[in-house]
A protein has these predicted regions:
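An N-terminal assembly and electron-transfer interface module characteristic of large anaerobic redox
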Residues: 1-157
Length: 157
């Protein structure tokens, strides 16, 4: 296993792993390279997705997820399995076309996010907690889903 915070010694072993798990869009190019060069297969998903989901009834809910693309898509797949009616993802950063689903949106600025929330009729929003105050009129459930590139925080409040 090698990931953020590991030293070069761990990264040097990348060609010997049995499978890569791509947890961010930024890692996709490296995974493709390792597959092409060494035959190492890869999967794209966030393995800890259930830790991000509070125990709620998602049945019939319309959900917006604003996060990096792999985490957002992993949350989407889990919510759809739990009965969500629709799940749309959006993000400000790298959006790989091979990870896009119909309705996914690349945000240019805060106004894009505000407009999406105002016009989206969402029941639930998953996004970094610092974004909650951008849409004080949102009456649904806001779930703080930490996004380091947005708030600069890895964990905590």
């Amino acid at each position: 296993c090698y990931c953020m915070g590991d030293g070069l010694e761990e990264v040097k072993k990348a060609s010997s792993v049995s499978k890569n798990i791509v947890v961010s869009p930024a890692a996709l190019m490296a995974a493709k390279y390792l597959e092409k060069t060494f035959g190492t297969p890869y999967e794209i998903y966030y393995p800890l997705v259930e830790e991000l989901l509070p125990e709620l009834d998602y049945t019939g809910k319309k959900v917006l997820i604003v996060h990096q693309q792999v985490i957002a898509d992993s949350i989407r797949r889990e919510l759809l399995e739990r009965g969500a009616k629709t799940v749309q993802t959006a993000g400000w950063f790298m959006m790989k076309k091979e990870l896009l689903a119909d309705g996914d949106m690349s945000l240019r600025d805060e106004d894009d996010y505000i407009e999406l929330v105002q016009n989206g009729d969402f029941d639930i929003i998953f996004a970094d907690g610092c974004m909650e105050r951008m849409t004080p009129e949102f009456k649904g459930r806001f779930i703080n889903t930490r996004h380091f590139a947005v708030s600069g925080k890895l964990i905590g409040k």
